[in-house]
């Protein structure tokens, strides 16, 4: 399995509760009900800065939240923070708040934090992500703490250490830059604190839930043309990390949902990723709305339905992370990849810096003996010695024991939201909240950042916020569907893998080489083309597939007709029936095949003896 860009999930380090924000306005009264706790999880965790120079990333909480904001962003990941930067740049008078359930990110320059390379997601930023970051003036800061990847080096199953094949992406217009996800978040955080601290509040360890999406969304008879007021009402609850979970792949947070503050906003962006708190609330709202509609209203009502399409993971893989320091005579800018015999385990390594520090994934099935927690380190060492000869010497016994001991982590399942990604005229979703894919092809984080750029375009092109919200939904809902559908078709198990991935890859290679003016290159090449939408890729490949199968069908039909004609001619010459001649030709072809195999086997035996 090819991994153009792998996400390397962390086992997050301990972090004491931190909430950092610059307060606007007065503190809200706190609403209290009988105490209860809600558990929430997220695949991101952070580490408290250890150097005093990084204190600006860990300001003491003021616990003061304004009763209203111009805009609220739920989710403090890359897409959420870039959304806040985008909004701040659009209007310097905007009062913006960002809320996230986990602590503030570590400093992007704190080397003590980033030395533990196997504790963090690594993401590869391609042309989509780089273009979005550059548009909002943060790319140079991100690039400064990233490592370039200019190609791959692959080892086929059973290959010796010296038999790796190096492939450089010489014709690739954009060089992929790799860095831990949390480091990217840290860069964006610092950029906000340095440039927009008086405008943007960064509130950590808070959970946000909508109670009203505005009058136009809450009105069950509303249509897209409704111009009713659309302020969104939210409840904000304090959270804290759960003791003992800081070293798990998916750290948890306890949120006091019965002790909350109420906030209103004119514009809500849901960028809370896999948590999907806003998306879940939108889905519940849509179910409630549609339950009150008759059949005619459901079919011809003015509002499109909203649903999160959740696919069953029929090709599930889990992984363990392995820190690796490659030798000084190896290149530090390659993705190193190897597969074991039978494709039992795949080894994928990406650079965590430009000094030869790598973080590797061991991808395997969840029932594999080595995927279990507290597995035998001797068996893991033996597996490396037999299958990954080139990497075994790079992992010492202590690290091998730690890898064997820790539990495996899950890759995300495919999901997308649609056919609209707005609720009323004041709420939109973006990022992983609308499209979740496995990290094999580097599309998740990059597309999430691109969403922010498209949202900026939609707002700039529209006379009102409402028009911008609907424009963004129209542009990106279909993209989310296409992205997830394409990615899932490239990750099917068994025979489906042959039909949906391998065979199309072969056909695209053949036909594009024969007629590049008519047939597009394979999907991997299309991913690298700038300015090409996923919906276009999907439609283009459907056209290619119909044309390819039509041509193959015509060729096959012509071969059958030609064979029948040949049989008739030979039968007429010999005075035999068509069936007799046809059977003789089939038997002859079969015997010729056997003779060819026997001859090849004999030559191989002679070579072995020699």
What is each residue range found by the language model?
Residues 1-27:
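N-terminal chloroplast transit peptides
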Residues 107-193:
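Active-site-adjacent segment of FAD-dependent monooxygenases/related oxidoreductases
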Residues 88-118:
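Glycine-rich FAD pyrophosphate-binding loop
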Residues 204-232, 239-241:
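A conserved short coil-to-beta-strand element within the FAD-binding core of flavoproteins
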């Amino acid at each position: 399995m090819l991994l153009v860009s792998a996400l390397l999930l962390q086992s997050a380090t301990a972090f004491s509760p931190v909430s950092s924000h610059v307060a606007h306005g007065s503190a809200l009264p706190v609403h209290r009900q009988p105490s209860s706790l809600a558990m929430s999880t997220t695949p991101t965790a952070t580490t408290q800065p250890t150097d005093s120079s990084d204190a600006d990333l860990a300001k003491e909480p003021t616990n003061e939240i304004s009763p209203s904001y111009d805009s609220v962003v739920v989710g403090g990941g890359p897409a959420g923070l870039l959304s806040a930067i985008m909004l701040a740049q659009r209007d310097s008078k905007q009062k913006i708040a960002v809320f996230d359930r986990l602590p503030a990110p570590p400093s992007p320059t704190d080397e003590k934090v980033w030395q533990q390379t196997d504790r963090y997601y690594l993401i590869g930023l391609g042309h989509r992500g780089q273009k979005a970051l550059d548009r909002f003036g943060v790319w140079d800061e991100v690039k400064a703490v990233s490592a370039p990847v200019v190609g791959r080096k692959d080892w086929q199953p059973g290959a010796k250490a010296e038999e790796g094949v190096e492939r450089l992406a010489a014709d690739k217009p954009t060089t992929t830059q790799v860095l831990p996800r949390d480091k990217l978040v840290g860069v964006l955080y610092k950029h906000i604190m340095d440039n927009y601290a008086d405008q943007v509040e960064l509130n950590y360890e808070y959970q946000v839930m909508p109670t009203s999406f505005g009058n136009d969304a809450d009105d069950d008879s509303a249509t897209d043309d409704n111009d009713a007021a659309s302020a969104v009402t939210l409840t904000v609850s304090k959270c804290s990390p759960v003791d003992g979970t800081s070293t798990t792949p998916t750290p948890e947070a306890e949120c006091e949902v019965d002790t909350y503050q109420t906030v209103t906003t004119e514009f809500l962006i849901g960028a809370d990723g896999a948590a999907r708190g806003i998306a879940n609330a939108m889905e519940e709202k849509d179910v409630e709305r549609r339950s009150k509609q008759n059949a005619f209203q459901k079919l011809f009502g003015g509002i499109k339905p909203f649903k999160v399409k959740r696919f069953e993971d029929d090709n599930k893989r889990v992984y363990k992370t392995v820190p690796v320091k490659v030798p000084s005579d190896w290149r530090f800018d390659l993705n190193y990849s190897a597969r074991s015999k039978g494709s039992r385990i795949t080894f994928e390594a990406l650079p965590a810096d430009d000094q030869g520090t790598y973080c590797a994934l061991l991808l395997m099935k969840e029932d594999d003996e080595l995927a279990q927690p507290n597995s035998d380190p001797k068996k893991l060492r033996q597996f490396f010695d037999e299958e990954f000869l080139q990497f075994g010497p790079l992992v010492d016994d202590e690290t091998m024991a730690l890898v064997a001991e820790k539990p495996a982590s899950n890759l995300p399942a495919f999901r997308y939201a649609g056919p609209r990604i707005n609720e009323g005229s004041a709420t939109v979703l973006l990022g992983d909240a609308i499209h979740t894919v496995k990290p094999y092809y580097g599309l998740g984080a990059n597309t999430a950042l691109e969403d922010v750029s498209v949202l900026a375009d939609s707002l700039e092109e529209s006379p009102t916020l409402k028009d911008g919200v609907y424009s963004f939904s129209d542009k990106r809902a279909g993209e989310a569907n296409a992205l997830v559908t394409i990615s899932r078709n490239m990750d099917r198990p068994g025979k489906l893998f042959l039909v949906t991935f391998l065979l199309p890859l072969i056909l695209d290679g053949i036909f594009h080489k024969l007629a590049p003016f008519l047939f597009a290159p394979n999907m991997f090449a299309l991913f690298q083309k700038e300015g090409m939408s996923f919906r276009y890729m999907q439609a283009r490949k459907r056209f290619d597939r119909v044309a390819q199968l039509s041509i193959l069908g015509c060729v096959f039909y012509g071969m059958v007709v030609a064979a029948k004609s040949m049989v008739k001619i030979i039968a007429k010459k010999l005075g035999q029936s068509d069936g007799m001649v046809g059977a003789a030709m089939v038997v002859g072809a079969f015997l010729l095949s056997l003779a060819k195999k026997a001859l090849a086997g004999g030559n191989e035996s002679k070579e072995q003896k020699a």
